[in-house]
Amino acid sequence: MSRSFYVDSLIIKDTSRPAPSLPEPHPGPDFFIPLGMPPPLVMSVSGPGCPSRKSGAFCVCPLCVTSHLHSSRGSVGAGSGGAGAGVTGAGGSGVAGAAGALPLLKGQFSSAPGDAQFCPRVNHAHHHHHPPQHHHHHHQPQQPGSAAAAAAAAAAAAAAAALGHPQHHAPVCTATTYNVADPRRFHCLTMGGSDASQVPNGKRMRTAFTSTQLLELEREFSSNMYLSRLRRIEIATYLNLSEKQVKIWFQNRRVKHKKEGKGTQRNSHAGCKCVGSQVHYARSEDEDSLSPASANDDKEISPL
């Protein structure tokens, strides 16, 4: 028995441990980390790991990606495989993407409200920008300290496998989708057809006042043609109308009153000509009745 029996037994035990199997590809929606995300936003686990990670379990998520991928982007070539390419060891790794772009990491996540910020489809244009290259396999015994490196390598291998099979993905989701105007702006256009037919060309609907409302409005208008803000609110609350409806009604009523006033003035002017002539004639008679005395005085004074 050698002196380093315990060390040899640990090494043999580690090498005989089966490699963690990759998760099977799910036909459902896949979520990806956007390539344009700056490095500070990509969280790396150099301290605590994924909270859902257990002993012997395999977790492929953005939180389990270490900063090793970012530091080795310039030295390790981009890796991508075809349909028949596979990973030969637990330490096999490949960095997908160019030297200036972040790797595209694939993981199976449950649907959550926060998942809406990731595009559920892969743009096929990325496949043309990343030509396939040779795999770089690194065979090394798995040690307890290299668990994070193994997770990163498996994530990169999954990304390479995902890039090698573009036919399994859903239709393209381009960036122009986010340039579409907010659909909430067209909320009025998506309403029922009855509303659109009642308001053609954006015209305001005519308010149908009841007889009680018209009576109260006419009574208030006869006492005061111009309302204050407080009085307008009181009338609107009392008649179950809006302040704008009361304001518009009084505006229209004042215009109507002016038109009626102009019409009555014209009619009065036409009748005043006769009346005025009669009055003028009466005044002339009064003047004539008073004129003889003055005329006699003038006649009496005139010979002098």
UniProtKB/Swiss-Prot annotation:
Signal peptide: none annotated. Residues 116-151, 283-304 are annotated as: Disordered. Pfam families: Homeodomain. Residues 141-151 have a biased composition (Low complexity). It is found in: Nucleus; Cytoplasm. Residues 123-140 have a biased composition (Basic residues). CDD domains: homeodomain (cd00086). InterPro entries: GSH1/2, HD, HD_metazoa, Homeobox_CS, Homeodomain-like_sf. SMART domains: HOX. One of its GO terms (biological process) is telencephalon regionalization. Residues 202-261 bind DNA. The keyword Transcription regulation applies. It comes from the Eukaryota. Disulfide bonds: none annotated. GO terms for molecular function: DNA-binding transcription factor activity, RNA polymerase II-specific; sequence-specific double-stranded DNA binding. The keyword Ion transport does not apply. Keywords: Cytoplasm, Developmental protein, Disease variant, DNA-binding, Dystonia, Homeobox, Intellectual disability, Nucleus, Transcription, Transcription regulation. One of its GO terms (cellular component) is cytoplasm. Transcription factor that binds 5'-CNAATTAG-3' DNA sequence and regulates the expression of numerous genes including genes important for brain development. During telencephalic development, causes ventralization of pallial progenitors and, depending on the developmental stage, specifies different neuronal fates. At early stages, necessary and sufficient to correctly specify the ventral lateral ganglionic eminence (LGE) and its major derivatives, the striatal projection neurons. At later stages, may specify LGE progenitors toward dorsal LGE fates, including olfactory bulb interneurons. It is linked to Diencephalic-mesencephalic junction dysplasia syndrome 2: An autosomal recessive neurodevelopmental disorder with onset at birth, characterized by severe global developmental delay, hypotonia, spastic tetraparesis, generalized dystonia and severe intellectual impairment. Brain imaging shows a unique brain malformation characterized by agenesis of putamina and globi pallidi, dysgenesis of the caudate nuclei, olfactory bulbs hypoplasia, and anomaly of the diencephalic-mesencephalic junction with abnormal corticospinal tract course. Belongs to the Antp homeobox family. This is GS homeobox 2. It comes from Homo sapiens (Human).
